[in-house]
């Protein structure tokens, strides 16, 4: 580290790095799950990809020595201030539970160390609070706070404002709920003055002192309850450092990062000074590859060794309360300001000039009509909710605020508690379905205002399509309670929004072409269920399709002339609204991917049996008349594989391709096997393998790898003794071929997990030696094994066990042998 990058020594310096961790919501609003996202490959979806690149690595970030050996594993969340979007946290809880738990643990440990936890809350689904109705703003805040309390087990002291968008009514709502402080961009301060009195001083981002907290008094609360605080404290992050971190190269070097962060420190000031920055948390690993490593080294080593205290905002506020007050900038129209719109909050309602780019000459005039259409829809749905909700709830809007408890826990006892507290006295369980439909209508009306829908370059972008899906779901639920054609009036307003892409057209066309076809009703669930059953009749009837519970009342399949005809009755129950439907289905499978499903609602069993007998008889006698008869008896509407959800659809086509795949791989393996000795001779002579044979070789050898591993997986201790596996490894190395089988890697990961479980169950020399031999073999294989969790486990084990082992090893030969093997094992894990 040279003199120019060395961080300043500072007994009064307090460093805070805030990470705003959030992802645009991506789930299908009807099934509450994220479907496959091809753009995220090789991962299933973007949440999974960014978890692998950012959220997970930050929970166990490595610091290394010069040769690249792991010195320490740091949970960055223990040392940074952070917020996670509630919708993202709900996904992590289910799909990345280890990472989720480390985030929760980090807050607990920081609270023990500093007296205040690192985590702060976030307004629920990242809507721009200044642009919401007061009632919606209130719900967004309440839901964000209740979600935080549910996860972290404590009250939040602060709340992250989406896009740091703020105005005074927003501050008033936050203060009313006990929020102590917020974090803003320095561009959002207008003027400052001492709390003790004095004249106001106009400030700009470059002149604002970001090393202290400010108090912001709220005019709306000045004449209110004298017992209630009429102010919120504000931290302004250092803008230039945040910009350099997000868009520059600061995360390449922990010393540069630390020096840049601490640059504002002034040793002449004899008071605690805050050196703080706030950025999107995804910078640490996703936007900036390996950014979590520099962050970890800066937090755990460079900053403390330079005399700075790594803390969080709440802890700093306790030792250095504000001595200055601030007035906030409110943007060009006085509606509020934000960190990502130079004009205030125009980016989420008009073509203000702020954009992510896109093609030359693109514009964002579509933002206004989209906002107007949503505001119109929101008002219509609010009227329905208020009028209809009065029949189910003591106070409909209070019930909406309390509904977050059900969103977080949909178990029967949670529903019973909710309705006992919020439902009208005597509300019967059979009325819960309508009540839940109203609440879900409101939930999606809130979700449709997610800021991402307006942030990006075009109306037809993925994020805007997502908020349109929320609107469609809210509409679908609202239509149960209204005879008015709400959708047509909404779509008429969307027609005023024009995409920059000529082929996409206007908002109405996008809605009709891209949104309406993906709307889900019970018939699509039936179609999905029966096609899944026909695809694999050996498995049991699926009991669930996503959150829908499926009870098969009866079903039968008849086959004739290569046509399968399935007929049956199902009872479906929504796991969200508890709505129940009894439906009869008739599905013809004409071979390959050609399915035709027709669904009849509330069909009497006698009528169902009669139809089934008639159709089965025609299939047996004149199969060519089956489809015309189905159309005659059941109508012209039908569903196909096109209407199946993405995961199952991919499985259907993969299964259909499998015989061709196996035949092709078999032929390739045969031809490669015939040429293998010649190709090995070429390699010995230093000659280049032809591209065709390289491709054939990787296909062939990866197939063989899977076959060998499948045989060895039940007895993993024999892996290192397998001559066939060793020969395969040597041949791949000689020929320069990559072993990249996903299936093979999966089996190797399971074997590694098996060794970890053995070592965890009994810390013995044999268990350590078996794992060492396995990892030593893996280092010879041209295949990448994911070692993150193995390293985490081993690091924790050694922290807890190795000191006592080392102390006993001088007296005990068995312990000494174990210690030696563990040292060798540590080396194979890159410690």
Short names for language-model regions:
Residues 92-96, 187-189, 193-211, 216, ...:
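Extended, Lys/Arg-enriched charged tracts that mediate electrostatic binding to polyanionic substrates
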Residues 678-831:
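Extended alpha-helical scaffold segments
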Residues 137-161, 224, 262-276:
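CE4/NodB-like, metal-dependent polysaccharide N-deacetylase domain
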Residues 163-170, 189-193, 318-322:
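Beta-rich nucleic-acid/ligand-interaction surfaces
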Residues 101-118, 142, 154, 175-224, ...:
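Acidic, His- and aromatic-enriched active-site or binding-groove loops in soluble protein domains
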Residues 3-64, 87, 200-534, 561, ...:
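Active-site and substrate-binding clefts of carbohydrate-active enzymes
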Residues 14-19, 23-134, 139-140, 157-161, ...:
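Short, well-structured secondary-structure segments
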Residues 113-128, 151-160, 183-189, 232-241, ...:
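Core alpha/beta catalytic barrel or barrel-like domain that forms the active/cofactor pocket
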């Amino acid at each position: 580290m040279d003199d120019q990058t060395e961080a300043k020594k500072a007994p009064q310096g307090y460093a805070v790095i805030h990470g705003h961790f959030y992802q645009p919501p991506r789930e299908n609003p009807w099934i509450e799950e994220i479907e496959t996202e091809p753009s995220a490959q090789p991962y299933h979806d973007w949440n999974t990809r960014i978890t692998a690149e950012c959220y997970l690595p930050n929970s166990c970030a490595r610091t290394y020595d010069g040769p690249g050996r792991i010195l320490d594993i740091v949970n960055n969340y223990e040392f940074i201030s952070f917020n996670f979007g509630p919708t993202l946290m709900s996904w992590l809880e289910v799909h990345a539970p280890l990472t989720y738990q480390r985030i929760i643990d980090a807050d607990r440990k920081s609270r023990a160390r500093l007296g205040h936890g690192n985590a702060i809350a976030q307004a629920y689904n990242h809507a721009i609070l200044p642009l919401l109705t007061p009632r919606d703003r209130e719900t967004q805040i309440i839901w964000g706070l209740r979600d935080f309390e549910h996860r972290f087990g404590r009250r939040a002291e602060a709340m992250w404002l989406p896009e740091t968008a703020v105005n005074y009514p927003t501050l008033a709502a936050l203060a009313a709920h006990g929020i102590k402080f917020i974090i803003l961009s320095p561009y959002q301060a207008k003027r400052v003055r001492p709390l003790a009195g004095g004249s106001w001083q106009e400030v700009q981002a470059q002149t604002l002192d970001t090393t202290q907290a400010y108090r912001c008094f709220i005019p709306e609360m000045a004449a209110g309850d004298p017992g209630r605080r009429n102010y919120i404290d504000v931290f302004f992050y250092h803008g230039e450092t945040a910009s350099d971190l997000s868009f520059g190269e600061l995360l390449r070097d922990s010393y540069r990062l630390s020096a840049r962060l601490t640059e504002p420190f002034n040793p002449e000031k004899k008071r605690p000074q805050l050196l703080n920055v706030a950025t999107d948390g995804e910078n640490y690993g996703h936007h900036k590859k390996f950014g979590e490593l520099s962050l970890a080294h800066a937090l755990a080593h460079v900053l403390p060794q330079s005399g700075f205290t790594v803390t969080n905002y709440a802890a700093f506020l306790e030792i250095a309360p504000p001595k200055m007050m601030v007035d906030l900038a409110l943007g060009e129209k006085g509606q509020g300001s934000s960190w990502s719109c130079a004009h205030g909050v125009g980016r989420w309602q008009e073509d203000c000039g702020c954009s992510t780019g896109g093609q030359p000459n693109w514009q964002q005039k579509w933002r206004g009509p989209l906002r107007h259409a949503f505001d119109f829809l929101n008002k219509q749905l609010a009227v329905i909710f208020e009028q209809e909700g009065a029949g189910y709830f003591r106070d409909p809007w209070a019930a909406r605020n309390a509904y977050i408890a059900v969103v977080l826990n949909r178990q029967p006892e949670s529903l019973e508690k909710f309705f006992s507290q919020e439902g009208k006295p005597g509300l019967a369980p059979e009325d819960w379905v309508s009540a839940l439909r109203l609440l879900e209508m409101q939930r999606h009306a809130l979700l449709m205002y997610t800021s991402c829908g307006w942030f990006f370059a075009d109306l037809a972008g993925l994020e805007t399509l997502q908020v349109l899906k929320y609107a469609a779901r809210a509409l679908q639920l609202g239509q149960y309670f209204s005879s008015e054609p709400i959708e047509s009036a909404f779509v008429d307003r969307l027609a005023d929004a024009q995409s920059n892409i000529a082929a996409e057209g206007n908002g109405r066309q996008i809605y009709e072409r891209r949104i309406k076809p993906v709307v889900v009703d019970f018939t699509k669930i039936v179609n999905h269920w029966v096609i899944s059953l026909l695809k694999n009749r050996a498995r049991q009837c699926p009991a669930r399709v996503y959150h829908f519970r499926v009870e098969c009342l009866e079903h039968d399949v008849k086959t004739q002339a290569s046509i399968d005809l399935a007929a049956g009755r199902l009872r479906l129950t929504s796991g969200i609204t508890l709505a129940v439907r009894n439906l009869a289905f008739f599905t013809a499978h004409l071979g390959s991917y050609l399915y035709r499903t027709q669904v009849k609602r509330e069909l009497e069993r006698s009528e169902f049996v009669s139809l089934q007998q008639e159709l089965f008889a025609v299939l047996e006698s004149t199969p060519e008349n089956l489809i015309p008869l189905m159309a005659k008896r059941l109508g012209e509407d039908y569903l196909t594989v096109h209407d199946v959800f993405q995961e199952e659809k991919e499985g259907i086509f993969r299964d259909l391709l499998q015989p061709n795949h196996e035949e092709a791989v078999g032929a390739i393996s045969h031809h490669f096997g015939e040429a293998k000795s010649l190709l090995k001779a070429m390699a010995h002579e230093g000659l280049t393998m032809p591209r065709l044979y390289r491709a054939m070789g990787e296909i062939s050898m990866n197939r063989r790898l899977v076959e060998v591993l499948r045989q060895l997986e039940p007895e993993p201790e024999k892996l290192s003794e397998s001559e066939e596996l060793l020969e395969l490894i040597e041949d791949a190395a000689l020929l320069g071929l990559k072993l990249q089988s996903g299936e093979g890697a999966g089996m190797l990961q399971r074997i590694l997990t098996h060794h970890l479980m053995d070592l965890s169950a009994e810390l013995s020399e044999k268990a350590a030696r078996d794992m060492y031999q396995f990892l030593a073999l893996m280092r010879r294989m041209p295949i990448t094994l994911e070692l993150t969790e193995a390293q985490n486990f081993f690091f924790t084990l050694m922290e807890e066990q190795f000191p006592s082992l080392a102390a006993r090893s001088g007296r005990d030969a068995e312990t000494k042998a174990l210690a030696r093997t563990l040292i060798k094992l540590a080396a194979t894990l890159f410690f």
